[in-house]
Amino acid sequence: MDIEAGLDFLKKDKNMKVLINKYGRPDFNQGQDYFQSLLRSIVFQQLSGKAAKTIYERLVSLIPKTSNLCPNEVLKLNKDEMRKAGLSFQKINYVRNLADYFENNSLQKKDVEEMTDEEISKELIQIKGIGQWTVDMFLMFTLNRADILPYKDLGIQKGIMKIFKMKNLPSKNEMENCSKKWRPFRTIACWYLWRITDDKLSK
């Protein structure tokens, strides 16, 4: 994803230009491990950031220091230990489903880079515990795909509602229409939508 090109493009929109000038350059990490990224997303589902971070760190600490956080090591973990780390029974199953998938399927970087967003979504959603929101976060922050708009993300909904001065949260169609001017860099635009939603002082 060419962030500089995206910023130059988005600055043509007056609302985005204001946000870019206020919040600066967005931060997108690169080269994250696919399995670890999705594992972290599952742990973080429906939890506050602080609580999820603690549980994730406890889960990682269960892996022997001489080993890597990989599918095979996760499958070796005792369910009772995972429960004591703070994972619900449902999430334990989701984590094991994910590990089992990666243990038996070769999701190689070179293959993923050639797949479309839709193909990746179709592939990952078959894993129980992975929904569209998790796929969108994976596409945005692990693969750095440039034009992702997570329709189900409340922060993005609130950001669009705030920018376009809507009285209610936008529908999927409204979000699509409002974001057309940001294509093909909606991933970067979303970074700013999250910022304006988090900024309690923003008007």
Write out the residue ranges for each language-model feature.
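C-terminal accessory module of base-excision DNA glycosylases/AP lyases that mediates lesion recognition
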Residues: 1-27, 113, 132-141, 145-203
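A positional/architectural concept
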Residues: 13-67
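Alpha-helical ds-nucleic-acid-binding substructure associated with the helix-hairpin-helix region
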Residues: 15, 48, 52-126, 181-183
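Structural motif
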Residues: 28-36, 86-89, 179-186
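Short acidic alpha-helix initiation/capping motifs at coil-to-helix transition points
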Residues: 32-35, 72-74, 113-115, 151-152, ...
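A general alpha-helix detector
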Residues: 37-42, 58, 77-81, 119-123, ...
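Short alpha-helical scaffolding segments that buttress acidic/His motifs in well-ordered protein cores
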Residues: 38-43, 99, 138, 189-193
